[in-house]
Protein backbone atom coordinates (compact mmCIF):
# COMPACT_ATOMS: atom_id res chain seq x y z
CA UNK A 1 0.00 0.00 0.00
CA UNK A 2 2.81 2.39 0.91
CA UNK A 3 4.66 1.71 -2.33
CA UNK A 4 1.46 2.30 -4.35
CA UNK A 5 0.84 5.70 -2.68
CA UNK A 6 4.47 6.71 -3.32
CA UNK A 7 4.12 5.89 -7.03
CA UNK A 8 0.83 7.83 -7.22
CA UNK A 9 2.31 11.02 -5.73
CA UNK A 10 5.39 10.83 -7.99
CA UNK A 11 3.06 10.80 -11.00
CA UNK A 12 1.29 14.04 -9.92
CA UNK A 13 4.49 15.97 -8.99
CA UNK A 14 5.01 17.55 -12.40
CA UNK A 15 1.49 19.13 -12.69
CA UNK A 16 1.79 20.49 -9.13
CA UNK A 17 5.18 22.03 -9.82
CA UNK A 18 3.88 23.55 -13.03
CA UNK A 19 0.90 24.98 -11.17
CA UNK A 20 3.16 26.47 -8.51
CA UNK A 21 5.40 28.04 -11.14
CA UNK A 22 2.36 29.55 -12.85
CA UNK A 23 1.18 31.06 -9.57
CA UNK A 24 4.64 32.53 -8.90
CA UNK A 25 4.79 34.09 -12.36
CA UNK A 26 1.30 35.53 -11.92
CA UNK A 27 2.24 37.03 -8.58
CA UNK A 28 5.37 38.56 -10.10
CA UNK A 29 3.35 40.07 -12.94
CA UNK A 30 0.83 41.56 -10.54
CA UNK A 31 3.44 43.09 -8.28
CA UNK A 32 5.73 44.26 -11.09
CA UNK A 33 3.24 46.29 -13.20
CA UNK A 34 0.58 48.79 -11.93
CA UNK A 35 -3.00 48.22 -12.97
CA UNK A 36 -4.31 50.26 -15.90
CA UNK A 37 -7.76 51.79 -15.94
CA UNK A 38 -9.70 52.41 -19.13
CA UNK A 39 -9.58 55.99 -20.40
CA UNK A 40 -12.77 58.02 -20.49
CA UNK A 41 -11.49 60.12 -23.39
CA UNK A 42 -9.06 59.98 -26.29
CA UNK A 43 -5.68 58.30 -26.01
CA UNK A 44 -3.50 60.62 -23.94
CA UNK A 45 -0.31 59.38 -25.48
CA UNK A 46 2.70 57.63 -23.99
CA UNK A 47 3.41 57.78 -20.31
CA UNK A 48 6.45 59.62 -19.06
CA UNK A 49 8.16 58.93 -15.75
CA UNK A 50 8.31 61.60 -13.08
CA UNK A 51 11.47 61.61 -11.05
CA UNK A 52 10.65 61.60 -7.35
CA UNK A 53 13.30 62.01 -4.69
CA UNK A 54 12.68 60.07 -1.51
CA UNK A 55 9.78 58.03 -2.93
CA UNK A 56 9.44 55.07 -5.31
CA UNK A 57 9.28 55.98 -8.97
CA UNK A 58 5.67 56.13 -10.08
CA UNK A 59 4.39 56.16 -13.66
CA UNK A 60 1.39 58.52 -13.96
CA UNK A 61 -0.41 58.92 -17.25
CA UNK A 62 -1.64 62.52 -17.68
CA UNK A 63 -4.43 63.14 -20.14
CA UNK A 64 -5.00 66.71 -21.38
CA UNK A 65 -6.46 66.77 -24.88
CA UNK A 66 -7.13 70.03 -26.71
CA UNK A 67 -10.76 70.02 -25.62
CA UNK A 68 -9.75 69.36 -22.05
CA UNK A 69 -7.26 72.20 -22.21
CA UNK A 70 -10.12 74.48 -23.13
CA UNK A 71 -12.21 73.17 -20.23
CA UNK A 72 -9.23 73.66 -17.94
CA UNK A 73 -9.01 77.31 -18.96
CA UNK A 74 -12.72 77.80 -18.36
CA UNK A 75 -13.00 75.85 -15.13
CA UNK A 76 -9.65 76.69 -13.62
CA UNK A 77 -8.23 73.26 -12.80
CA UNK A 78 -6.45 70.33 -14.44
CA UNK A 79 -8.11 67.06 -15.31
CA UNK A 80 -6.03 63.87 -15.09
CA UNK A 81 -6.21 60.10 -15.24
CA UNK A 82 -6.93 58.28 -11.97
CA UNK A 83 -3.95 57.44 -9.85
CA UNK A 84 -2.85 53.84 -9.37
CA UNK A 85 -3.96 52.13 -6.20
CA UNK A 86 -1.63 52.65 -3.23
CA UNK A 87 0.38 55.26 -5.16
CA UNK A 88 1.63 58.48 -3.58
CA UNK A 89 1.43 61.97 -5.13
CA UNK A 90 3.74 64.45 -3.47
CA UNK A 91 3.71 68.20 -4.13
CA UNK A 92 6.54 69.11 -1.81
CA UNK A 93 7.98 72.43 -0.77
CA UNK A 94 11.62 72.96 -1.61
CA UNK A 95 13.12 71.34 1.48
CA UNK A 96 15.81 68.70 1.50
CA UNK A 97 13.91 66.14 3.54
CA UNK A 98 10.76 66.40 1.32
CA UNK A 99 10.10 64.88 -2.06
CA UNK A 100 10.22 67.03 -5.19
CA UNK A 101 8.34 66.36 -8.38
CA UNK A 102 9.72 67.38 -11.77
CA UNK A 103 6.74 68.41 -13.87
CA UNK A 104 8.63 69.41 -16.99
CA UNK A 105 7.39 67.87 -20.21
CA UNK A 106 8.28 68.55 -23.84
CA UNK A 107 5.35 69.52 -26.06
CA UNK A 108 4.66 71.65 -29.15
CA UNK A 109 3.07 74.27 -26.91
CA UNK A 110 6.22 74.93 -24.94
CA UNK A 111 7.51 74.31 -21.43
CA UNK A 112 4.92 73.40 -18.82
CA UNK A 113 6.90 74.16 -15.72
CA UNK A 114 5.09 75.96 -12.92
CA UNK A 115 7.79 77.95 -11.14
CA UNK A 116 5.39 80.18 -9.24
CA UNK A 117 2.99 77.51 -8.14
CA UNK A 118 2.32 76.92 -4.46
CA UNK A 119 3.62 73.54 -3.37
CA UNK A 120 2.32 71.46 -0.51
CA UNK A 121 2.93 67.92 0.77
CA UNK A 122 -0.23 66.02 -0.08
CA UNK A 123 -0.33 62.24 0.26
CA UNK A 124 -3.13 60.44 -1.52
CA UNK A 125 -3.16 56.82 -0.50
CA UNK A 126 -5.53 53.93 -0.35
CA UNK A 127 -8.20 55.30 -2.69
CA UNK A 128 -8.29 53.93 -6.26
CA UNK A 129 -10.46 56.76 -7.62
CA UNK A 130 -8.71 59.79 -6.18
CA UNK A 131 -7.20 61.88 -8.99
CA UNK A 132 -5.11 65.02 -9.36
CA UNK A 133 -8.32 66.89 -10.09
CA UNK A 134 -9.14 66.68 -6.39
CA UNK A 135 -5.69 68.01 -5.51
CA UNK A 136 -6.18 71.19 -7.53
CA UNK A 137 -9.70 71.69 -6.20
CA UNK A 138 -8.26 71.47 -2.72
CA UNK A 139 -5.80 74.19 -3.60
CA UNK A 140 -8.61 76.31 -5.00
CA UNK A 141 -10.38 76.13 -1.67
CA UNK A 142 -7.20 77.23 0.09
CA UNK A 143 -6.65 80.36 -1.99
CA UNK A 144 -6.99 83.30 0.35
CA UNK A 145 -7.67 86.15 -2.12
CA UNK A 146 -10.54 85.37 -4.51
CA UNK A 147 -10.11 88.69 -6.24
CA UNK A 148 -6.62 87.96 -7.46
CA UNK A 149 -7.80 86.12 -10.55
CA UNK A 150 -9.78 89.12 -11.72
CA UNK A 151 -6.63 91.25 -11.83
CA UNK A 152 -5.42 89.18 -14.77
CA UNK A 153 -2.00 88.16 -16.07
CA UNK A 154 -0.19 88.94 -19.29
CA UNK A 155 -1.38 86.62 -22.04
CA UNK A 156 0.93 83.98 -23.52
CA UNK A 157 1.04 82.58 -26.98
CA UNK A 158 0.11 78.93 -26.66
CA UNK A 159 -3.12 77.43 -25.33
CA UNK A 160 -1.13 75.30 -22.90
CA UNK A 161 0.57 78.36 -21.47
CA UNK A 162 -2.82 80.04 -21.10
CA UNK A 163 -4.00 77.05 -19.11
CA UNK A 164 -0.91 77.26 -16.97
CA UNK A 165 -1.58 80.94 -16.31
CA UNK A 166 -5.10 80.18 -15.09
CA UNK A 167 -3.86 77.50 -12.72
CA UNK A 168 -1.10 79.73 -11.38
CA UNK A 169 -3.68 82.45 -10.70
CA UNK A 170 -5.80 80.08 -8.69
CA UNK A 171 -3.03 78.78 -6.49
CA UNK A 172 -0.65 81.75 -6.31
CA UNK A 173 -2.36 84.79 -4.77
CA UNK A 174 -0.37 87.80 -3.74
CA UNK A 175 1.56 86.87 -0.59
CA UNK A 176 -0.66 87.30 2.40
CA UNK A 177 -3.28 88.98 0.20
CA UNK A 178 -1.26 92.18 0.58
CA UNK A 179 -3.41 94.79 -1.15
CA UNK A 180 -0.70 97.40 -0.63
CA UNK A 181 1.38 95.58 -3.25
CA UNK A 182 -1.31 95.94 -5.93
CA UNK A 183 -0.09 99.18 -7.57
CA UNK A 184 3.43 97.84 -8.11
CA UNK A 185 2.08 94.49 -9.26
CA UNK A 186 -0.24 96.18 -11.76
CA UNK A 187 2.63 98.24 -13.10
CA UNK A 188 4.75 95.17 -13.76
CA UNK A 189 1.86 93.23 -15.29
CA UNK A 190 1.01 95.96 -17.79
CA UNK A 191 -2.42 96.90 -16.42
CA UNK A 192 -3.79 100.41 -16.74
CA UNK A 193 -4.48 102.62 -13.77
CA UNK A 194 -8.22 102.52 -14.47
CA UNK A 195 -9.09 98.83 -14.96
CA UNK A 196 -12.68 99.56 -16.00
CA UNK A 197 -11.50 101.34 -19.15
CA UNK A 198 -12.61 98.95 -21.85
CA UNK A 199 -10.34 97.76 -24.64
CA UNK A 200 -10.81 99.87 -27.73
CA UNK A 201 -11.81 103.06 -25.91
CA UNK A 202 -8.94 104.91 -27.54
CA UNK A 203 -8.65 108.36 -29.10
CA UNK A 204 -10.99 109.38 -31.90
CA UNK A 205 -8.21 109.11 -34.44
CA UNK A 206 -7.50 105.46 -33.64
CA UNK A 207 -9.04 102.40 -35.24
CA UNK A 208 -12.75 102.54 -36.01
CA UNK A 209 -15.24 100.52 -34.05
CA UNK A 210 -18.36 99.07 -35.59
CA UNK A 211 -21.51 100.94 -34.66
CA UNK A 212 -24.62 98.83 -34.45
CA UNK A 213 -27.94 100.47 -35.10
CA UNK A 214 -30.23 99.02 -32.47
CA UNK A 215 -33.81 100.11 -32.09
CA UNK A 216 -32.94 101.55 -28.71
CA UNK A 217 -29.56 103.20 -28.26
CA UNK A 218 -27.63 102.30 -25.16
CA UNK A 219 -28.40 104.56 -22.22
CA UNK A 220 -25.29 106.63 -21.47
CA UNK A 221 -26.21 106.74 -17.78
CA UNK A 222 -26.12 102.95 -17.56
CA UNK A 223 -23.28 102.13 -19.90
CA UNK A 224 -20.26 100.26 -18.64
CA UNK A 225 -17.15 101.97 -17.40
CA UNK A 226 -17.96 105.45 -16.15
CA UNK A 227 -20.30 104.30 -13.39
CA UNK A 228 -17.16 103.66 -11.30
CA UNK A 229 -15.94 107.25 -11.74
CA UNK A 230 -14.79 109.04 -9.67
CA UNK A 231 -12.98 107.50 -6.72
CA UNK A 232 -12.00 109.30 -3.54
CA UNK A 233 -10.60 112.83 -3.54
CA UNK A 234 -7.16 111.41 -2.72
CA UNK A 235 -7.29 109.00 -5.66
CA UNK A 236 -8.31 111.81 -7.98
CA UNK A 237 -5.46 114.03 -6.83
CA UNK A 238 -2.94 111.22 -7.24
CA UNK A 239 -4.14 110.04 -10.64
CA UNK A 240 -2.63 110.83 -14.03
CA UNK A 241 -5.89 112.54 -14.96
CA UNK A 242 -5.25 115.26 -12.38
CA UNK A 243 -1.58 115.66 -13.28
CA UNK A 244 -1.01 119.01 -14.96
CA UNK A 245 2.05 117.71 -16.83
CA UNK A 246 0.41 114.65 -18.39
CA UNK A 247 -1.17 114.96 -21.83
CA UNK A 248 -3.87 112.58 -23.02
CA UNK A 249 -1.48 111.09 -25.59
CA UNK A 250 1.11 110.40 -22.91
CA UNK A 251 2.25 106.86 -22.26
CA UNK A 252 1.04 107.30 -18.67
CA UNK A 253 -2.56 107.36 -19.92
CA UNK A 254 -1.94 104.57 -22.42
CA UNK A 255 -3.61 106.62 -25.17
CA UNK A 256 -6.96 105.65 -23.72
CA UNK A 257 -10.15 107.63 -23.36
CA UNK A 258 -10.61 109.18 -19.91
CA UNK A 259 -12.46 106.98 -17.42
CA UNK A 260 -15.42 109.34 -17.13
CA UNK A 261 -16.44 108.59 -20.73
CA UNK A 262 -18.48 105.45 -21.31
CA UNK A 263 -18.10 103.10 -24.25
CA UNK A 264 -21.35 104.56 -25.60
CA UNK A 265 -19.89 108.06 -25.35
CA UNK A 266 -16.79 107.08 -27.33
CA UNK A 267 -18.86 105.38 -30.03
CA UNK A 268 -21.19 108.36 -30.41
CA UNK A 269 -18.34 110.87 -30.43
CA UNK A 270 -16.68 108.89 -33.21
CA UNK A 271 -19.95 108.72 -35.15
CA UNK A 272 -20.50 112.48 -34.88
CA UNK A 273 -16.89 113.31 -35.78
CA UNK A 274 -16.33 110.82 -38.60
CA UNK A 275 -19.70 109.54 -39.83
CA UNK A 276 -20.58 110.13 -43.48
CA UNK A 277 -23.53 112.50 -43.93
CA UNK A 278 -26.15 110.68 -46.01
CA UNK A 279 -29.31 112.72 -45.41
CA UNK A 280 -30.48 115.98 -43.85
CA UNK A 281 -33.59 117.88 -42.78
CA UNK A 282 -34.26 121.30 -41.30
CA UNK A 283 -35.61 121.60 -37.79
CA UNK A 284 -38.72 123.83 -37.81
CA UNK A 285 -38.39 127.13 -35.94
CA UNK A 286 -34.73 126.56 -35.14
CA UNK A 287 -32.94 128.69 -37.73
CA UNK A 288 -29.57 127.26 -38.70
CA UNK A 289 -30.05 123.92 -36.94
CA UNK A 290 -29.88 120.93 -39.30
CA UNK A 291 -30.74 117.34 -38.48
CA UNK A 292 -28.39 115.00 -40.33
CA UNK A 293 -28.18 111.24 -40.65
CA UNK A 294 -24.82 109.49 -40.51
CA UNK A 295 -23.86 106.19 -42.06
CA UNK A 296 -21.27 103.75 -40.80
CA UNK A 297 -18.84 101.97 -43.13
CA UNK A 298 -21.01 98.86 -43.02
CA UNK A 299 -24.09 100.81 -44.01
CA UNK A 300 -22.25 102.55 -46.86
CA UNK A 301 -21.69 99.17 -48.49
CA UNK A 302 -25.45 98.65 -48.61
CA UNK A 303 -26.92 99.68 -51.95
CA UNK A 304 -30.24 100.73 -50.40
CA UNK A 305 -29.71 104.00 -48.51
CA UNK A 306 -31.84 104.19 -45.37
CA UNK A 307 -34.16 107.13 -44.86
CA UNK A 308 -33.38 109.81 -42.31
CA UNK A 309 -36.15 108.61 -40.01
CA UNK A 310 -34.69 105.10 -40.05
CA UNK A 311 -31.22 106.37 -39.22
CA UNK A 312 -32.52 108.54 -36.39
CA UNK A 313 -34.54 105.70 -34.90
CA UNK A 314 -31.30 103.71 -34.76
CA UNK A 315 -29.40 106.48 -32.97
CA UNK A 316 -27.39 107.48 -36.07
CA UNK A 317 -28.41 111.15 -36.26
CA UNK A 318 -27.12 114.45 -34.96
CA UNK A 319 -27.99 118.14 -34.88
CA UNK A 320 -25.58 120.58 -36.54
CA UNK A 321 -25.91 123.84 -34.65
CA UNK A 322 -24.54 127.37 -35.01
CA UNK A 323 -20.85 128.18 -34.46
CA UNK A 324 -21.90 130.26 -31.47
CA UNK A 325 -23.13 127.08 -29.79
CA UNK A 326 -19.63 125.56 -29.61
CA UNK A 327 -19.63 125.94 -25.78
CA UNK A 328 -22.07 123.01 -25.77
CA UNK A 329 -19.08 120.78 -26.49
CA UNK A 330 -17.36 122.04 -23.36
CA UNK A 331 -20.59 121.57 -21.40
CA UNK A 332 -20.76 117.92 -22.43
CA UNK A 333 -17.27 117.28 -21.07
CA UNK A 334 -18.09 119.17 -17.86
CA UNK A 335 -21.10 116.87 -17.45
CA UNK A 336 -18.98 113.74 -17.86
CA UNK A 337 -16.04 114.87 -15.72
CA UNK A 338 -18.45 115.63 -12.86
CA UNK A 339 -20.02 112.19 -13.21
CA UNK A 340 -23.52 113.54 -13.98
CA UNK A 341 -23.98 111.75 -17.34
CA UNK A 342 -27.14 113.58 -18.38
CA UNK A 343 -25.96 115.58 -21.43
CA UNK A 344 -26.03 114.17 -24.93
CA UNK A 345 -22.64 113.59 -26.64
CA UNK A 346 -21.32 116.59 -28.57
CA UNK A 347 -18.30 117.25 -30.80
CA UNK A 348 -16.97 120.07 -32.97
CA UNK A 349 -16.64 119.31 -36.67
CA UNK A 350 -15.81 120.95 -39.99
CA UNK A 351 -18.07 119.62 -42.73
CA UNK A 352 -17.24 119.10 -46.41
CA UNK A 353 -20.27 117.08 -47.53
CA UNK A 354 -21.87 118.13 -50.84
CA UNK A 355 -25.27 117.40 -49.29
CA UNK A 356 -24.97 120.39 -46.95
CA UNK A 357 -25.49 124.08 -47.78
CA UNK A 358 -22.34 126.15 -48.26
CA UNK A 359 -22.54 127.94 -44.91
CA UNK A 360 -22.12 124.55 -43.24
CA UNK A 361 -19.07 123.67 -45.35
CA UNK A 362 -17.15 126.98 -45.30
CA UNK A 363 -14.44 125.52 -43.07
CA UNK A 364 -15.77 126.84 -39.78
CA UNK A 365 -16.19 124.53 -36.80
CA UNK A 366 -19.73 123.76 -35.71
CA UNK A 367 -21.05 121.72 -32.80
CA UNK A 368 -22.79 118.43 -33.59
CA UNK A 369 -25.06 117.06 -30.88
CA UNK A 370 -26.18 113.43 -30.83
CA UNK A 371 -29.89 112.99 -31.51
CA UNK A 372 -31.31 110.64 -28.89
CA UNK A 373 -34.17 108.77 -30.61
CA UNK A 374 -36.42 108.46 -27.55
CA UNK A 375 -36.50 111.95 -26.02
CA UNK A 376 -40.12 112.72 -25.21
CA UNK A 377 -41.82 115.95 -26.32
CA UNK A 378 -45.28 117.21 -25.42
CA UNK A 379 -47.76 117.62 -28.27
CA UNK A 380 -48.73 121.12 -27.09
CA UNK A 381 -46.97 123.63 -29.41
CA UNK A 382 -46.34 125.93 -26.45
CA UNK A 383 -44.69 123.12 -24.48
CA UNK A 384 -42.99 121.10 -27.23
CA UNK A 385 -39.57 121.71 -25.64
CA UNK A 386 -40.65 119.82 -22.54
CA UNK A 387 -41.47 116.25 -21.61
CA UNK A 388 -43.74 117.59 -18.87
CA UNK A 389 -45.25 121.00 -18.17
CA UNK A 390 -43.82 122.42 -14.97
CA UNK A 391 -44.10 125.86 -13.38
CA UNK A 392 -41.78 127.45 -10.84
CA UNK A 393 -44.19 127.07 -7.92
CA UNK A 394 -44.89 123.43 -8.77
CA UNK A 395 -41.15 122.82 -9.08
CA UNK A 396 -40.52 124.25 -5.61
CA UNK A 397 -43.36 122.15 -4.20
CA UNK A 398 -41.97 118.88 -5.55
CA UNK A 399 -38.55 119.78 -4.15
CA UNK A 400 -40.13 120.30 -0.73
CA UNK A 401 -41.93 116.93 -0.96
CA UNK A 402 -38.75 115.06 -2.03
CA UNK A 403 -40.70 113.46 -4.86
CA UNK A 404 -39.45 110.24 -6.41
CA UNK A 405 -42.49 108.41 -7.80
CA UNK A 406 -45.57 109.57 -9.74
CA UNK A 407 -49.13 109.24 -8.54
CA UNK A 408 -49.02 111.68 -5.66
CA UNK A 409 -49.32 115.40 -6.35
CA UNK A 410 -47.15 117.25 -7.14
CA UNK A 411 -44.76 114.41 -8.09
CA UNK A 412 -44.12 113.92 -11.85
CA UNK A 413 -42.07 110.71 -11.50
CA UNK A 414 -38.60 112.21 -11.87
CA UNK A 415 -36.21 111.21 -9.09
CA UNK A 416 -35.72 113.88 -6.45
CA UNK A 417 -31.93 113.88 -6.84
CA UNK A 418 -32.22 114.70 -10.55
CA UNK A 419 -33.07 118.30 -9.74
CA UNK A 420 -29.92 118.67 -7.64
CA UNK A 421 -27.76 117.39 -10.51
CA UNK A 422 -29.46 119.81 -12.88
CA UNK A 423 -29.06 122.75 -10.49
CA UNK A 424 -25.36 122.02 -9.99
CA UNK A 425 -24.76 121.72 -13.73
CA UNK A 426 -26.69 124.87 -14.60
CA UNK A 427 -25.04 126.88 -11.82
CA UNK A 428 -21.50 126.03 -12.94
CA UNK A 429 -22.30 126.89 -16.55
CA UNK A 430 -24.83 129.61 -15.67
CA UNK A 431 -27.47 128.11 -17.95
CA UNK A 432 -30.64 130.09 -17.24
CA UNK A 433 -33.04 128.76 -19.87
CA UNK A 434 -34.26 125.75 -17.92
CA UNK A 435 -34.89 126.94 -14.38
CA UNK A 436 -34.84 130.73 -14.78
CA UNK A 437 -35.52 131.74 -18.35
CA UNK A 438 -37.04 134.99 -17.04
CA UNK A 439 -33.71 136.09 -15.46
CA UNK A 440 -35.34 136.61 -12.07
CA UNK A 441 -32.21 135.60 -10.15
CA UNK A 442 -29.64 138.06 -11.56
CA UNK A 443 -29.27 141.36 -13.38
CA UNK A 444 -29.18 140.49 -17.11
CA UNK A 445 -27.42 142.32 -19.89
CA UNK A 446 -29.60 144.40 -22.25
CA UNK A 447 -28.83 141.94 -25.03
CA UNK A 448 -30.10 138.91 -23.09
CA UNK A 449 -33.23 137.33 -24.64
CA UNK A 450 -35.13 137.68 -21.37
CA UNK A 451 -34.75 141.46 -21.67
CA UNK A 452 -35.38 141.69 -25.39
CA UNK A 453 -38.52 139.57 -25.10
CA UNK A 454 -39.62 141.39 -21.93
CA UNK A 455 -39.82 138.13 -20.02
CA UNK A 456 -38.31 139.60 -16.87
CA UNK A 457 -41.49 141.56 -16.24
CA UNK A 458 -43.18 138.30 -15.21
CA UNK A 459 -40.87 137.83 -12.23
CA UNK A 460 -43.39 139.76 -10.12
CA UNK A 461 -45.90 136.94 -10.58
CA UNK A 462 -44.27 133.54 -9.79
CA UNK A 463 -47.41 131.69 -10.90
CA UNK A 464 -46.64 132.67 -14.51
CA UNK A 465 -43.08 131.39 -14.49
CA UNK A 466 -42.53 128.24 -16.51
CA UNK A 467 -39.60 125.83 -16.70
CA UNK A 468 -38.22 124.97 -20.16
CA UNK A 469 -36.20 122.06 -21.57
CA UNK A 470 -37.32 119.68 -18.83
CA UNK A 471 -36.86 116.50 -20.85
CA UNK A 472 -36.68 112.76 -20.22
CA UNK A 473 -36.22 109.70 -22.42
CA UNK A 474 -38.89 107.04 -22.78
CA UNK A 475 -36.27 104.40 -22.01
CA UNK A 476 -35.49 106.09 -18.67
CA UNK A 477 -38.30 108.49 -17.68
CA UNK A 478 -37.07 108.99 -14.11
CA UNK A 479 -33.85 110.73 -15.24
CA UNK A 480 -33.52 114.11 -16.92
CA UNK A 481 -31.76 114.80 -20.23
CA UNK A 482 -29.90 118.08 -20.72
CA UNK A 483 -30.09 119.92 -24.07
CA UNK A 484 -29.09 123.45 -25.18
CA UNK A 485 -26.25 123.64 -22.69
CA UNK A 486 -24.15 126.48 -24.14
CA UNK A 487 -24.27 128.43 -20.88
CA UNK A 488 -22.59 131.74 -20.09
CA UNK A 489 -18.91 131.46 -19.24
CA UNK A 490 -18.38 135.23 -19.34
CA UNK A 491 -20.87 135.84 -16.55
CA UNK A 492 -19.05 137.72 -13.75
CA UNK A 493 -18.76 136.12 -10.34
CA UNK A 494 -20.64 138.93 -8.61
CA UNK A 495 -23.66 138.26 -10.83
CA UNK A 496 -23.95 134.51 -10.40
CA UNK A 497 -27.54 133.29 -10.43
CA UNK A 498 -28.14 131.61 -7.06
CA UNK A 499 -31.83 131.26 -7.87
CA UNK A 500 -30.80 128.12 -9.77
CA UNK A 501 -29.96 126.54 -6.39
CA UNK A 502 -33.18 127.53 -4.65
CA UNK A 503 -34.96 124.62 -2.95
CA UNK A 504 -32.04 122.19 -3.42
CA UNK A 505 -31.19 120.40 -0.17
CA UNK A 506 -28.26 118.22 -1.31
CA UNK A 507 -25.82 117.55 -4.13
CA UNK A 508 -24.24 114.49 -5.81
CA UNK A 509 -21.21 113.27 -3.93
CA UNK A 510 -19.29 112.32 -7.09
CA UNK A 511 -19.47 115.84 -8.51
CA UNK A 512 -18.55 117.46 -5.20
CA UNK A 513 -15.48 115.19 -4.98
CA UNK A 514 -14.24 116.47 -8.33
CA UNK A 515 -14.80 120.09 -7.32
CA UNK A 516 -13.11 119.58 -3.94
CA UNK A 517 -10.10 117.80 -5.47
CA UNK A 518 -8.97 120.86 -7.42
CA UNK A 519 -8.56 118.65 -10.49
CA UNK A 520 -11.41 120.03 -12.59
CA UNK A 521 -9.24 122.13 -14.92
CA UNK A 522 -6.68 119.42 -15.64
CA UNK A 523 -9.33 116.75 -16.11
CA UNK A 524 -11.25 118.96 -18.54
CA UNK A 525 -8.08 119.64 -20.52
CA UNK A 526 -7.53 115.91 -20.99
CA UNK A 527 -11.17 115.32 -21.81
CA UNK A 528 -11.29 118.10 -24.40
CA UNK A 529 -8.25 116.64 -26.17
CA UNK A 530 -10.64 113.90 -27.27
CA UNK A 531 -12.07 116.51 -29.66
CA UNK A 532 -9.19 117.78 -31.85
CA UNK A 533 -11.41 120.18 -33.84
CA UNK A 534 -12.74 121.88 -30.71
CA UNK A 535 -9.27 121.87 -29.15
CA UNK A 536 -7.74 123.61 -32.16
CA UNK A 537 -10.65 126.04 -32.61
CA UNK A 538 -10.27 127.26 -29.03
CA UNK A 539 -6.51 127.71 -29.18
CA UNK A 540 -5.55 124.61 -27.23
CA UNK A 541 -4.73 124.65 -23.54
CA UNK A 542 -3.75 128.32 -23.56
CA UNK A 543 -6.97 129.41 -25.23
CA UNK A 544 -9.09 127.37 -22.81
CA UNK A 545 -7.26 128.57 -19.71
CA UNK A 546 -9.62 131.44 -18.86
CA UNK A 547 -12.90 129.54 -19.19
CA UNK A 548 -11.55 126.59 -17.22
CA UNK A 549 -10.41 128.92 -14.44
CA UNK A 550 -13.91 130.40 -14.42
CA UNK A 551 -15.43 126.95 -13.98
CA UNK A 552 -12.96 126.16 -11.19
CA UNK A 553 -13.85 129.38 -9.37
CA UNK A 554 -17.57 128.72 -9.70
CA UNK A 555 -16.99 125.26 -8.28
CA UNK A 556 -15.35 126.77 -5.22
CA UNK A 557 -18.28 129.16 -4.82
CA UNK A 558 -20.65 126.20 -4.93
CA UNK A 559 -18.60 124.35 -2.30
CA UNK A 560 -18.87 127.41 -0.09
CA UNK A 561 -22.64 127.44 -0.60
CA UNK A 562 -22.86 123.76 0.40
CA UNK A 563 -20.82 124.37 3.54
CA UNK A 564 -22.65 127.56 4.48
CA UNK A 565 -26.07 125.91 4.33
CA UNK A 566 -24.85 122.56 5.69
CA UNK A 567 -26.28 120.70 2.70
CA UNK A 568 -26.07 116.92 2.39
CA UNK A 569 -24.31 114.81 -0.23
CA UNK A 570 -25.94 111.79 -1.87
CA UNK A 571 -24.49 108.87 -3.77
CA UNK A 572 -25.23 108.15 -7.41
CA UNK A 573 -27.39 105.15 -6.55
CA UNK A 574 -29.68 107.24 -4.32
CA UNK A 575 -32.99 108.07 -6.08
From Swiss-Prot:
Residues 53-58 are annotated as: O-glycosylated at one site. Its main location: secreted. It comes from the Eukaryota. Pfam families: FAM198. Residues 1-29 form the signal peptide. O-glycosylated with core 1 or possibly core 8 glycans. Residues 143-153 have a biased composition (Basic and acidic residues). Keywords: Endoplasmic reticulum, Glycoprotein, Golgi apparatus, Membrane, Secreted, Signal. Residues 143-162 are annotated as: Disordered. It is found in: Secreted; Endoplasmic reticulum; Golgi apparatus; Membrane, Caveola. This is Golgi-associated kinase 1A. It comes from Homo sapiens (Human). The gene is GASK1A.
Amino acid sequence: MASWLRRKLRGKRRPVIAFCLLMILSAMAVTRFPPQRPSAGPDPGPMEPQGVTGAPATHIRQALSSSRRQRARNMGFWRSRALPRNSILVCAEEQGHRARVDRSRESPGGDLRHPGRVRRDITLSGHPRLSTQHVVLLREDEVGDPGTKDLGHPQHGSPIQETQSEVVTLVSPLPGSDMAALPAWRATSGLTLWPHTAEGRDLLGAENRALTGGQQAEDPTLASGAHQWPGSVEKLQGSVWCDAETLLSSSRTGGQAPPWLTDHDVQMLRLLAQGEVVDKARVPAHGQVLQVGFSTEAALQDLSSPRLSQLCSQGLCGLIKRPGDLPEVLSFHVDRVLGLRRSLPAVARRFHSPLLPYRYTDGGARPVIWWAPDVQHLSDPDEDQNSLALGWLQYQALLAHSCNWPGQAPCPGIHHTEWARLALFDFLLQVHDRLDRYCCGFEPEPSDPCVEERLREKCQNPAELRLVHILVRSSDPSHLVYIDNAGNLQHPEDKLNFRLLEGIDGFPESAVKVLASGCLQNMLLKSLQMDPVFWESQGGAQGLKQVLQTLEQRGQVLLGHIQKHNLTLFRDEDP
